[in-house]
Amino acid sequence: MTAKDVAQSLSERIAPYADVRVVGIPRALMYHRLGTKWRTFFEALGREVVLSPASDRAVFERGQLLSVDECCLTSKLYLGHVAAVAPLCDAVFVPSFALPGTFRSYCTKFQALPDLVTNAFALVDEPVRVMSALIAEGADDKTEREGYVSLGIQLGATAKEARLAWKQAKKAQEERDAALAEAQRDLVRRIRKVPEGARPLTILVSSHPYVAHDPFVGGTVTDALRAAGAEVLFADEFDHAKALKKADEFSRSLPWIVNRELVGAILSLHEYVDGIVLMSAFPCGPDSMTNDAIARCVRGKPILTLTLDAQSGSAGVETRVESFVDILTYQKRGGYFHE
């Protein structure tokens, strides 16, 4: 082996993704929470970013064929998005989520996601080039930055360039989150200014962002609520830091950071809404525990619990939502005995 070969081999180990010019990001799972950060990071390093198309039945069915039965609905959908974006890019970004703290963890599927994707496609002899990194979202800045700097170096950037890209990405994500939280506060203020008798029905939708904001998963529910004339608030758009602090009033031992944020948002927005919709994708473990506790312990507002799966027809979901809205409307008017 020549010196040139040794140097090339060493370079490939240090920067295995240096040849990647187009990065594919599946439009599923944590893209709905962190997509702004990821896109900004890669673009700051001079990469082009392409997204998979919006979710639909075809994308899901492709993912279902690649998945085992035990995977949750959104994991199956994710595999479909990987299949859709893989031909459009040099590598697909599939991060692995570290556990930044005892009460700031994520569902364990996020740790194993790169292995899940790699093996699912290998089993059908359709290998996909996966670009991964261990990132600690929700940890302190130093710990989180280390994961992104490591990824940047693997892309061939210097540590300084990677730190700058992370800084830009973090700022863009914070601005996006702050804008959503401010828009929600503004909507609540505008609703409160309307006289009680003319105030629209206001419903809080609580679910993971990859359920609430995915057109194939939660889109039917939010569309049905709006079609019925309701104003819809999303728990995941509430200020994350305030939600985490408020969640301590509900439980100090709830381990999953996103579920803690959702609980805190429910407690914070409780007095401003007429009803709450709890949505989860079958068979989500964290949601099954958290939503049951919410239904038992959060009092004073009607709650509709929806568990969505591949067999959930839109007609059935729409019927349940419409019935829930009808009940809330009657209640708002004073019950069945109003004049």
Each language-model region and where it sits:
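An N-terminal assembly and electron-transfer interface module characteristic of large anaerobic redox
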Residues: 1-339
